[in-house]
Amino acid sequence: MNSPTMKSEQLTPKLSPMSFCLDDQRNAGSFQNLLNSPTKLKLDTGPIGNSLLYPTSLSKLSELSRGGRSKQRRGSDTMRSVSPIRFQFLNNTPKMLKPEYLSQTTSNLPLLSALLKNSKKTTSEGQNSNPDPLNIEKNIIKQSIKDKLEQLRSSESVAQVQKKERNPPSFEAKVCAEEPILRKNAEGLLPSYVPVPATPLEDPENHGVRKVEDKGLRVVSGGSTQCLSTEVNELPKDLNLDNLPTDNNGFVQYGLKGNNNNNRYSFISSTSTDYEPEWCDGQQHISMQMASMANAEEANSREKSNLDIKIKQLELEITELKLQNEKLVHSMTTNRYIEERFMLEVMKDPSIQAQRSQRDIERKVKQLEKKFFNCKKVLKKLTESSAVVATSTSKTEGNSARIPCPKTRLARVSVLDLKKIEEQPDSSSGTSSEEDHLTNDDTDANTSEDLNVAFEEEPTSAISTTASVQSGESKRGFQLNLPVQVEKKEK
């Protein structure tokens, strides 16, 4: 992924004497620029003569007083922590003591013969291969060196031809003087040596200059600068000065001087403190942009292929997760089915069914025994009540002529007794209809017992109410659950 552009808000305040490197607009191009440019002083950001920060120059800042009455200045204030003197913005060590100059590294440039021989191969391979930014810079330097060497060769050949045209007899005399020397040296070795006359340079018919093809012959010049004494006017007109190689300080290297004198620098460049390597970084940035433009289509195709691969990987992961989910659902359903099957098998077990039926039978037997005892008690009470009624009737036979026998009526049953009868707990709620019938018989027996008790108490109440019966009016009737009222009769 490409790193985002570091364009943010202003990090340093406007009235601060320091400017952070991210606030510098020239650093928007490359990240290497950002690292190389240090934190700078920002004193005069306004128009000329109108500073936003200080109305005086930087040299007068040390002369300012602390304020107040005392105009003296301490020695510690000069080297205070906020003072820009304490900040070492650039490494100003002498270049002769730097490790890169003490340990001389061999130049990565190839030899001239290799450049001339492999010129065609490098051009064909450079077009096919994907150039890196460093390789592009090296190729540019190599190409510029080739062009300049070819231009120098052409200029030197032109100068030699002009010189030959000016003084041909001197060159011919030199050749004729060299021939007897060669002849004398060869006489000792080869006795049968035939002298060959020197061919003239100019033909009498054509009056033209012939090219002497002596590759091993070296022409000795009279002076050291005889061939290379070229003026500015003699330089080729199509020479592009922008493509000339430059050294580390930005000076142009012309010819072979730059390669032989790499360790010599000017006085200004060695002592300057405001050196900013932004120009070199700009050149590197331009070369990187060229490489990026050349490789833009390939980068786009690679990004598209990578995105397609990522999309396919995500689709595969989604399908795998779906399969896992289906497997989990299937396992859960199978587990539930197995649990239900085991429960049904347990419920259908004959031993459990036999135990349940035996418990139901025992419960029914206990209920029947309880009902039998209740019926026995009711019968006992009925026999006792019949004997009491017989004795009471024998006592009242003598007074039967005087007192008319009142009609017996059923006594009222209280509400509490009815609730008790209704709210009797059924021990076997889920039993069969036979158990319900037996419980109904039990309740009937209890009600009959209560009625018998009421009949036993009735004669005594009848004897006590004879006086009221003999009076004019009397209420007659019986009430059990629903009150029944008899009409009033006058006697």
UniProtKB/Swiss-Prot annotation:
Record-listed Phosphoserine modification sites: S16, S37
GO cellular component annotations of the record: cellular bud; cellular bud neck; cellular bud tip; cortical endoplasmic reticulum; incipient cellular bud site; mitochondrial outer membrane; mitochondrion
Region of interest (Disordered), ranges: 419-491
Membrane topology type: Peripheral membrane protein
Chief place of localization: other
Post-translational modification: Phosphorylated by the cyclin-CDK PCL7-PHO85.
Keyword flag Manganese: no
Record GO biological process: cell division; intracellular distribution of mitochondria; mitochondrion inheritance
Keyword annotations from UniProtKB, A to Z: Cell cycle, Cell division, Coiled coil, Membrane, Mitochondrion, Mitochondrion outer membrane, Phosphoprotein
Positions where Phosphothreonine occurs in the chain: T12
Renumbered residue ranges of the record's region Interaction with MYO2: 300-439
Superkingdom classification of source: Eukaryota
Coiled coil: 295-384
Molecular function, one GO term: phospholipid binding
Subunit and interaction comment: Interacts with MYO2 and PCL7.
Leftover remarks: Present with 1070 molecules/cell in log phase SD medium.
Function, as annotated: Involved in the guiding of mitochondrial tubules to the bud tip during cell division.
Name of the protein this chain belongs to: Mitochondrial MYO2 receptor-related protein 1
Native source species: Saccharomyces cerevisiae (strain ATCC 204508 / S288c)
